[in-house]
Amino acid sequence: MQNRKWLILFAPGLLMLLSLVIAARQLKTSSPALPWDPVATFSILGYDPATGEIGAAVQSRVFSVGNGVLWAEAGVGAVATQAIVDVSYGPQGMALLKQGVSPKDIIKRILDADPDPRPRDWTKKGRQFAVIDAKGEVAAYTGPEATKYAGDKQGKYCTAQGNILAGEAVVANMVKAFEETKGHLSMRLMAALDAGQAAGGDTRGMQSANILIVGKGMGVWLNNDVVLRLQVDDSPEPLKEMRRLVEAWNERRAKNQQRPVG
């Protein structure tokens, strides 16, 4: 008898709770899953007015982050594409740079032209990209739906941007490190990546990194504008390995500069 009274008393509440659980499950299953992992990362674009070199660097908790994030051409500029990424932003940005369009206008033009074909699960509001031209002018865009923390910060001849970060300090520290570090552009980009990681970096961890530097006729051998291209695709400590490679390259560069010509 007491069990029946208990059932009568609490049955409405139990039914309501059950209906809420079922509704929540239906909502979860009806929400579209992302077709690909967002390129959650932090990157920096930089320019050295003393040499004319343009560089880009990136680190992320995805495999082979350099495959589709960084774009650069000597005497033209560089682009970084990430977050809910549309990789075509890279070549689009480079084409507009060649036409003499400013980085700020490039950002606007590309966003305006984006058809946003998958607004529910791959929206352009989640995109993040940055542009630097051959004079060091920069601009960046962080969409309101890029996974938090997401943001960008511009400095003198540089722009840093990232998403799924520990906080604003990641990009702020990257800019500070780039501006304050002496030496070749590769060392300044490397310092920026290290500073970003020291501030918390990508909250999911580390896996891959990439550095790309271009300069007109400044690469090794004939007719080569690629000064440096380094990629760590899969490592528990990609920045440690990247720094080793950058320092090894700078040692070799210093030795080559000491060789007599002719």
Each language-model region and where it sits:
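Bacterial Sec-dependent signal peptides at the C-terminal "C-region" and cleavage site
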Residues: 3-33, 37
